[in-house]
Amino acid sequence: EQEDFQSKLANEMHEYEQFSIRHFFEQVLEGELCVTEIYDEAAKWSLDLSASCYNLLFLYVQQEKENGSEREMNTFVHLQEEILQYFLRFPQYILFRWNVNCYGVLVKCDAEEMEDYTQRAIAQIQMNCESQNANADWYVVVGTPVERLSMLKECYDRVNHYGAYRFLYPQ
């Protein structure tokens, strides 16, 4: 019973942390915080946002067949874990959950490295999602790099604009 309580508490704390980080990124991307507030909030979550260039990448991924077998579900969960672990290995990427099927990645680095880190991220996602047994529907939307945190709202607006084209002009 004590273990159940501790497990439940740990899960609730993790959910709260994820919600809070998501809320923080919502505020940043909607332009609701000034730069000082962004850095203060980021410090609360031990997020280092220092860089000379920023970009956003949104990854939408879901299981190809909603009612797939347990094996297919496990394969899909493993796929998600592989993708997320890639981003967690590099300080140039800050990963956050955006919604049920979407993860956001803040890419932060020097301007001359931005194209490389962005392309590496896309290549890694593509490699994972197009593997023989991935069983995933996916797409990535990438913004246009900006030089200041205060400009992330513009980058986010472009990502939303680019993402809308997926529905207006499906492949």
Predicted segments with their positions:
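Interdomain helical linkers/hinges and coiled-coil/dimerization scaffolds
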Residues: 1-121, 142-167, 171
